[in-house]
Amino acid sequence: MRNQALLNDGGTPLYSLYEIAGFTDGTMPGHDWYDTFMNDAASMQRYNVNISGGNNRVKYLVNAGYLHQNSLIDAEKNDNYNPALKLHRFNILANVDVTLHRYLNCFLNTNVTIDRINQGYNGTGDIMNSIYQMAPTVPGPITEDGKVITAEYNEYPTYGLINRSGYSHQTGINLNVAYGMNLDLGFLTKGLSVKGIVGYEANYDGTIYGSTDYARYAANGSGLFGTHTTLPLSLSKTANMRYFINFQGFINYNRIFGGKHEVDAFVSYFNENMMKNGDLPYDRLSLMGHVKYGYDSRYYIQGDFTYDGTEQFKPGNRFKFFPTVSAA
């Protein structure tokens, strides 16, 4: 059927009459390459520790976690490197809330995640594509003395993609910190409060690549296939880092008068700065406002606006005003 499909598309048949006869009488290999290169299941381990407590003035929460996950792809470790896909993830979360005064409280939230990912040099998509391209009649995947076998139509056999092409080792670090204070101004007028938050986020992504090539041997036993030769590992490294700093300020007012008149309003200010190695900085400013009036929990009218801008646009056209009004 595969031969016929190729012929219908104007291609060349994949299997010769000799291979078809050999596959029928059992003299030709009949590999299930998916079963050869894929595991039935992949293990995953997850551990978490939580600590929380406090009193009327101070409350805290600490969570530490570890995750280890293996891959469904069946890779083989060699003397120089391990191409098996493995994920190690560590994360720590720490939150503290402090009541400084009857009207004033603050918080500090911190979250750190570290990922370490080891895998082969080639991606999962390339490997899966190779598995489905390999004909079941191809012997191997390696000879008794460890030589990689391939077919004429497949320059990159699955075994070589997984085990003989190299590796990559990636480290990712993500840090998030937020500090905020909330002041209840109810002593001035009921329902009025102000809030400020300073946030910081930093991301690091670094990868070490070890790439190599390997000799291929023809499935028909004629010797070397193509011009590929076995090469020593070639190492390279990439690293990227970026950070965000933002400030948010809010003035909130929420109050009900006479049991039927509801007023909800706020004004907020947002400022964000981003830096990334090799790129120009990015700045954004936003001023937002919202006011809503409700009567008897049935009729509402609401107005909102955003005054938003960034230095990414040309001078004189960096800020825009976006108003909206609705009623129900």
Regions found by a protein language model. Give the residues of each.
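Outer-membrane beta-barrel translocator domains and adjoining extracellular loop/strand segments
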Residues: 73-79, 119-125, 207-213, 276-282, ...
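Extracellular loop and loop/strand-boundary signature of outer-membrane beta-barrel proteins
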Residues: 34-37, 78-82, 95, 162-168, ...
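Short secondary-structure subsegments characteristic of cysteine-rich extracellular domains
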Residues: 77-97, 197-199, 318, 322-326
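Structural signature of Gram-negative outer-membrane beta-barrels, strongest in the C-terminal barrel
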Residues: 99-101, 235-248, 254-328
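Membrane-embedded beta-strand positions of outer-membrane beta-barrel proteins
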Residues: 62, 108, 179, 194-196, ...
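Structural signature of outer-membrane beta-barrel channels/translocons
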Residues: 52-56, 65, 97-99, 103-105, ...
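Surface-exposed loop/turn segments flanking beta-strands in extracellular/periplasmic regions
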Residues: 2-28, 126-157, 208-235, 262-265, ...
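Flexible loop and strand-edge segments within Gram-negative outer membrane beta-barrel domains
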Residues: 25-65, 69-72, 83-157, 166-174, ...
